[in-house]
Structures are given as structure tokens and as C-alpha cells.
Amino acid sequence: DQKFSNKFYETMIKNKRVDIHTRLFRLDFLKITGFAVLLLGAIVLSYIYLLPPLAEKSVEILPETVDDEIGNLFLDQYIKEQDVDKIRTLKLQEFANGLKLNNSKPLNFTVINSNEVNAFALPNGHIVVHSAILKGMKTPDELVALLGHEAAHVNHRHSIKMLSRNLAGYFLVSLLFSDVNGAIAILAENAQQIHALSYSRKFEEEADSEGLKILVANKFDPNGIVRLFEQLESNESKYIPQILSSHPLTAKRKQS
């Protein structure tokens, strides 16, 4: 009858409206979820690929006294725990003083007795050399190549730049609010990470290039840097030298 037909029609219209609302809700939910996923992805990608280079670039606004402060904080604690070879330290310092290392600040050298094949530069201009890497050298050219390489890390502030990259989020937030002292404090709190930093390929190639120029400028055999690489590789056949964890040796570096 007419009454039943009208009621049936009203029910159909109502259900259709409910169905439309449900579809719209689902569509909005999918849009919101998709946007949230895209936003999260953008944040993650920015943190990985955008913030570290920005943090590295921001180091330029920090005075080099920051490098000295961070280096001193690490060195004061580190040296207490090491067996310093005072005689070799004096000889190495004397040898280095006679070289043109293009250094932007005074360079100080310390030799420590260690079976680990390693050498590393601190941002304050202090270069630590392990006795094991010295024992493996056959010519002065290799030593000049090593010192030139490490001096380049100091000159280009590589360790401070890498530390800033590793702490990019905290570091940039401080600088964003013009809190330079806060940024410096963050670096200082993490000064002990300096020893464990792994330089980027770009920094290593930059240091290799400058090390080669230093060899030539001081009238040493440029092949000294090749022999240095060969020594590191020969040690790698016995065990992975500590220096390779912070100075990755690549085929491209050897070829260049």
C-alpha cells in the first residue's frame, strides 16, 4: 500500500545517506592517514639527509676557540689513561716542527705505546699517534703523509663538523633560538665521542689531497701516501686497524 511504500522509500534514502557519510568518513580518514605518513616520512628524510649538512655548515659561525675547548676536554681525560712514549713524542714534535703543514693553529704531537694501528687529530690541534703505526713505516715519506693528512683534519675542522652532524637535531635547535652557548655546551657534553668519529668520504679525500700537497711542498716522495695505505692494508690482513674505523680506506682514495 501507499503507507508501506513511503516508509520503504524513506528507509532507503536514510540508508543511502548513512552510506554516503560512511564513505566520506573513510575517505577523510585515508586522506589524514596518508598525509600523516607523508609528513612522518618527510621528517625522517629531513633528519637523515637535510639536518646533518645544515649542522656541518653551521660550524662556520662558531669561533675556533670552541675547537680548542672540545679538544682539551677530550685530551685531558684521554692522556691520563694512556702510556705516553715521551722520547718518541719529543722526536716526533721536533720532526713535525720542521715541516710546512699549512696548519691554521699550533700543532702538538703525542706518541702513545699501543699495539693498535691508529692516529687521530683533535680539533685543538693535538695529534695522537700510536707507536704501532710508526713501527710499520719504512720511510719518512709515510710519516709526512700521515702528519699532513691529520693536520688537514685540524685545518678543515673535520672533527667538529662530524660531531655536529652526529648531534644535528640538538645542535640546530640551539642555534635556531640563537643559543650559541647552548650549541657549544652540547658539543662539549659529547667531547668523548671525538675518538670514535668516522669521517665521511668527502673529508677523507680532502685530507688525502692536502696530505699529498704537503708531501710535495716539503720535497718528499708523493708515493709516501700510497705506501701508507699499503701499510694499513697489510695490517688489515692480520686485524682491522683502529685507524680504518675512523679513516675508511676505499679503492677510490688509493687511486686518487
Please place each PLM-identified region on the residue numbering.
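A Zn2+-metalloprotease active-site environment signal
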Residues: 3-256
